[in-house]
């Protein structure tokens, strides 16, 4: 559910309140009420924002010349591949996030509708890491027989794609521990991750080890309510979900 679609939410704790949900409501239920058409004529709204994110603070690492000088000063063995690579900068970037939300509604108190569309695109400070989320929702309300019968029909769909790497901790640890005289990539291709290494690996190889996921959800529901008297009503509810 897109946050802007939420009108209110209620926490149900009593047995009488959660009985409708059977065993799934044994530990309580969070009931979310989403916005619907108001029947006040055509209305349209848009919300959007864009933000940039960057690392607040980063450790100062030795460059190639400083690395070699330190190794020589303390009599340490070292390899010099002739490069000057800042591996922390090689795996990070300036991130950005954008949100867009469009909703429109219309109709009369007896027959109204509301549709909304939300989009989130987030590129994190880690290269090749981010997510996209697309949400669409449509609700229609129709009254008949002197407003005694009320029908509510709704459709909801979402698509979520998460571009993630397998081990963020190893990525940063490896970038900070890597010899800066090594290149980020080999001249004839990429570095290969060493499966026997528990902590340090070529950062480029760690960055390419993916843990991507993609989810799609669809839900349609129909509720009919008939007021037989002022104190007695009959309801029927049906829903279909796919994930």
Locations of the language-model features?
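Short, glycine/acidic-rich beta->alpha junctions
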Residues: 12-15, 24-28, 96, 130-135, ...
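N-terminal periplasmic accessory domains that precede
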Residues: 19, 25-48, 100-103
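Short, glycine-/polar-rich solvent-exposed loops and beta-turns at beta-strand/coil boundaries
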Residues: 2-4, 21-26, 93, 129-132, ...
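Short acidic/polar hinge/loop motifs at secondary-structure boundaries
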Residues: 1-13
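Outer-membrane beta-barrel transmembrane strands
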Residues: 93-111, 118-121, 203-242
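Surface-exposed loop/interface segments of Gram-negative outer-membrane beta-barrel transport/assembly proteins
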Residues: 38-84, 125-127, 135-219, 235-243
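Residues that cap or anchor secondary-structure elements
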Residues: 16-17, 84
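Transmembrane beta-barrel domains of outer membrane proteins
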Residues: 12, 33-35, 103-107, 116, ...
């Amino acid at each position: 559910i897109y946050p802007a679609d939420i009108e209110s939410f209620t926490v149900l704790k009593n047995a009488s309140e959660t009985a409708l949900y059977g065993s799934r409501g044994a530990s309580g239920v969070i009931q979310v009420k989403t916005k619907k058409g108001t029947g006040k004529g055509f209305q349209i709204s848009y919300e959007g924002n864009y933000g940039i994110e960057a690392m607040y603070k980063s450790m100062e690492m030795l460059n190639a010349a400083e690395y070699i000088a330190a190794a020589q000063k303390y009599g340490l063995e070292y390899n010099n591949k002739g490069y000057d690579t800042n591996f922390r900068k090689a795996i990070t970037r300036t991130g950005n996030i954008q949100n867009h939300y469009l909703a429109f509604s219309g109709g009369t108190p007896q027959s109204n509708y509301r549709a909304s569309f939300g989009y989130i695109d987030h590129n994190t400070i880690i290269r090749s890491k981010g997510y996209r989320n697309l949400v669409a929702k449509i609700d229609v309300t129709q009254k008949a027989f002197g407003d005694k019968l009320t029908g509510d029909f709704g459709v909801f769909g979402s698509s979520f794609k998460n571009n993630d790497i397998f081990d963020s901790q190893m990525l940063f640890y490896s970038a900070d521990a890597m010899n800066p005289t090594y290149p980020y990539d080999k001249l004839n291709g990429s570095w290969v991750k060493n499966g026997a290494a528990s902590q340090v690996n070529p950062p480029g190889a760690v960055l390419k080890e993916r843990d991507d996921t993609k989810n799609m959800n669809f839900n349609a529901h129909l509720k009919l309510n008939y007021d037989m008297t002022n104190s007695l009503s009959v309801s029927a509810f049906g829903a279909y979900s796919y994930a």
